[in-house]
Every structure is written in structure tokens, then in C-alpha cells.
């Protein structure tokens, strides 16, 4: 981007896609944002699962990603068909949102990852943007917040511990106490 900017051609690139194949820190996205705040950052092609996966997805958004694309969306249940390719070395079914029913190909099983991603896809609407909030931490509870175009605020929290985590929602001089059960994810929505 720096080289394109030097010659006045930065408009050739409107954004950068990040993939997590090498486990680089999500903070690399913030470094790019800090140098090019008008440049879109999009996180694509990665699979996160379980409550620990929610923490990673939150980190992508904390570091300026405008999206998160789950990969792989659907696989077959046939163990001879899944995980084909040189980079797939798992000896079990890879993480996926949906699994085809082997007896009825028009039907599928919904996995826990489907519900993990739906905290975002159901409540964070197109055009929403991330807003500042106390991020918490992985040892207690972690949070990311968005403002939808209709004025609703969405807070998505993850509790990876074995105990209930209490917290206080504070917004525009109003507050409400809430909690996240052990080993769970919660979505909290309110209107401005």
C-alpha cells in the first residue's frame, strides 16, 4: 500500500483480506488500520469453534475486521469424502456449521458452530459497525459490541470459565446488571 500511495495509485486497492493459516496475531490487522485507516480489513476463510473460538472471532473485530467468514460451511458425513486435500491432516470430521445427513441428503445436522456464528449473523445486521466496549479478558468474560443501522446495540459475550460471570451493561448514563452462565456465549441487545 505504501508503494501504491507513493505513485498516487492507492485507489487500486480498497481492502485487504486476512487469513489465519499461519496463526499470526490479530493485532496485524490493527497495524494495517493504523497506517491506512481508510482501507477496509476483511477476515476470511478460517474456522473457529467452541467458546474459545468466540474469543478469537472477537479479537478479529477488535482489530478492525469488517467481517468474519467461516470456513467450511457444510461437509458430508461420509468419512471417505471429508477433509480431502493436501492441507487437511485431521483424522476426524473438520469443524463445520452443517453436516449432510447420510441417509437423507436433503437434510443436515446443525453443529454447535452454527449457533456460535449465529450470535453475529442473526443480531449484527448489514451496515452495523463495531463500537468501543470493555473487552474483558479470556480468563473471565470477553465482549465485543456493535451498533446496527436501526440504532440497536448488540453486545456479544463469551464466558470460558466454569463459573457464572456477572457484569454491568452501561450506556448513556444507564446501567443494567447481567451475567453469562459458565462455558457459554450470550448476546445482549438494547435500543438507544
Annotate each language-model stretch with its function.
Residues 1-192:
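Substrate-binding and catalytic surfaces of secreted/luminal carbohydrate-active proteins
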Amino acid at each position: 500500500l505504501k508503494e501504491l500511495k507513493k505513485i498516487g495509485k492507492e485507489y487500486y486497492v480498497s481492502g485487504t483480506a486476512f487469513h489465519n493459516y499461519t496463526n499470526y496475531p490479530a493485532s496485524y490487522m490493527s497495524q494495517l488500520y493504523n497506517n491506512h485507516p481508510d482501507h477496509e480489513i476483511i477476515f476470511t476463510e478460517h474456522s473457529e469453534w467452541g467458546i474459545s473460538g468466540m474469543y478469537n472471532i472477537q479479537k478479529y473485530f477488535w482489530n478492525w475486521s469488517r467481517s468474519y467468514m467461516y470456513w467450511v460451511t457444510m461437509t458430508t458425513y461420509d468419512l471417505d469424502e471429508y477433509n480431502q486435500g493436501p492441507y487437511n491432516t485431521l483424522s476426524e470430521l473438520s469443524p463445520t456449521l452443517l453436516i449432510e445427513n447420510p441417509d437423507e441428503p436433503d437434510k443436515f445436522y446443525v453443529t454447535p458452530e452454527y449457533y456460535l456464528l449465529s450470535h453475529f449473523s442473526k443480531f449484527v445486521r448489514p451496515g452495523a459497525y463495531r463500537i468501543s466496549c470493555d473487552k474483558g479478558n479470556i480468563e473471565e468474560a470477553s465482549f465485543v459490541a456493535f451498533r446496527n443501522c436501526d440504532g440497536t446495540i448488540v453486545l456479544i459475550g463469551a464466558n470460558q470459565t466454569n463459573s457464572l460471570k456477572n457484569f454491568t451493561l452501561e450506556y448513556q448514563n444507564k446501567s443494567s446488571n447481567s451475567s453469562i452462565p459458565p462455558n457459554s456465549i450470550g448476546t445482549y441487545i438494547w435500543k438507544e
